Amino acid sequence: ELVAFIWDYYVRHPEFVTILATENLHQGQHARKSQNLKALSGEAVGVLRPIIEAGQAKGLFRDDIDITHAYLMIASLCYFYNSNRHTLSSFLAVDLADKQAKADWLVFISDLALRGLRR
């Protein structure tokens, strides 16, 4: 499942989350200069496109889905938890680094993403 793939990538590569956060602090100045970034973003959205289109062909997913919006929804739900887990753990008095907490969040966001795409 795509949600699990993106989630697992962020969990296994916390350095990537840190790089994204740092790059955003610098207002994307290095990302704008990257020759490879557009190709990478095309691949990320490209992975999602056949999944969405297959779901639409089967009548499972809405016909009005914007692929970019769907990707942003999934990536946002995965990124926010991982990039803010330290402060949110303190704020919510919950250990968001706990294995079960992460598993529960993945189940929740997978369900949420499907609800957003289904007819």
Give the positions of each predicted feature:
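Amphipathic alpha-helical segments used for helix-helix packing
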Residues: 12-35, 84-91
